[in-house]
Amino acid sequence: MSGRVFLLLALVALASAIQRIKLEKRTYTREQYKFGSIQEHLKAKYVPGYIPNKDAFNEGLSDYSNAQYYGPVTIGTPPQNFQVLFDTGSSNLWVPCANCPFGDIACRMHNRFDCKKSSSCTATGASFEIQYGTGSMKGTVDNDVVCFGHDTTYCTDKNQGLACATSEPGITFVAAKFDGIFGMGWDTISVNKISQPMDQIFANSAICKNQLFAFWLSRDANDITNGGEITLCDTDPNHYVGNIAWEPLVSEDYWRIKLASVVIDGTTYTSGPIDSIVDTGTSLLTGPTDVIKKIQHKIGGIPLFNGEYEVECSKIPSLPNITFNLGGQNFDLQGKDYILQMSNGNGGSTCLSGFMGMDIPAPAGPLWILGDVFIGRFYSVFDHGNKRVGFATSRTGK
């Protein structure tokens, strides 16, 4: 057999062994992007018992709405289509419900699931509630078939639990381009102890040889439609270069690992290994406030308000690399990676630092959160079977 034929067969085998989910993305104007609401959302997400400042939330979109990347799933028989945010920082699937009140604007502006129109759906009647900064997302639990993407290859059985939302809080989800949230964290943090859909996919060895999923995010500002891709059950070497550096999980709640160090121009900005959570559901990169302030000063950030720092757009090419050590390997963020360049509404651009200070008290913290600012530069692999997270340089990380 020639080498060319062997390579072709290998590529065909790889293609059949994994599922690819194309992601879409959305960008935001300076006016829409509010760090205060993002910070409150993350504290509500990661600090047990935290009572958010609702005024901060009402300044603008929450971090879920600022998250740029979402993709398709179907639910039910026949399939009902939804766009969902794939969130490694939570562990429940929920979509808007067909019977939500007429006055619930967020629900009415999105696709809604109707259990009565699905021959495979069972309405359990069990109540469901997730606390957000502007209130609670409330609904009931249904059981039905959930499929990744637009085909029926990677699907759960009809007993998969999901939340059908009848009430969505405040303005949090009104402007979101996605319909609901698809949690990809661990079942230990799942509301109502509902197992997530990936559990069933991982259990099906006929279609899933490796219990993992991977994110490749496109940060190309010139491509306004392609958001990237998620692969299920294997990695895709077309999306990264070099070896994957692995870091074991600290605990099976979030995708929590140890960050060894953060270094700029030879100066270390962290003191020893510190917990970090890899979160596809947040757009920023956060760390302890005292450390982030030093980083902002180093990159010439000008403090504004609510933790925002502005940087002159013209200085991006000369900004220093910021090096994160994970899994024994260094990962360099360049200025173009950690500066958010967005329209200011006047035909120009405003550049904001993608770093945000946030203090999370013990025992949950101190903590770094590696959001899309980091994941957009580095191919990120979430290995459920081996309880670890891996990173490699994205082939087109921009």
Swiss-Prot record:
The protein's predominant localisation is cytoplasm
Short name of one Pfam family for this protein? Asp
Q: Please give the InterPro entries that the UniProt record associates with this protein.
A: Aspartic_peptidase_A1 (IPR001461), Aspartic_peptidase_AS (IPR001969), PEPTIDASE_A1 (IPR033121), Peptidase_aspartic_dom_sf (IPR021109)
Q: In which tissues is it expressed?
A: Highly expressed in intestine and to a lower extent in body wall muscles, hypodermis and neurons.
Indicate where this protein resides in the cell.
Cytoplasm; Lysosome; Secreted
GO-annotated cellular components: cytoplasm; extracellular region; lysosome
Q: Which residues are glycosylated?
A: 321
* Protein name, entry field: Aspartic protease 3
Query: Which gene produces this protein?
Result: asp-3
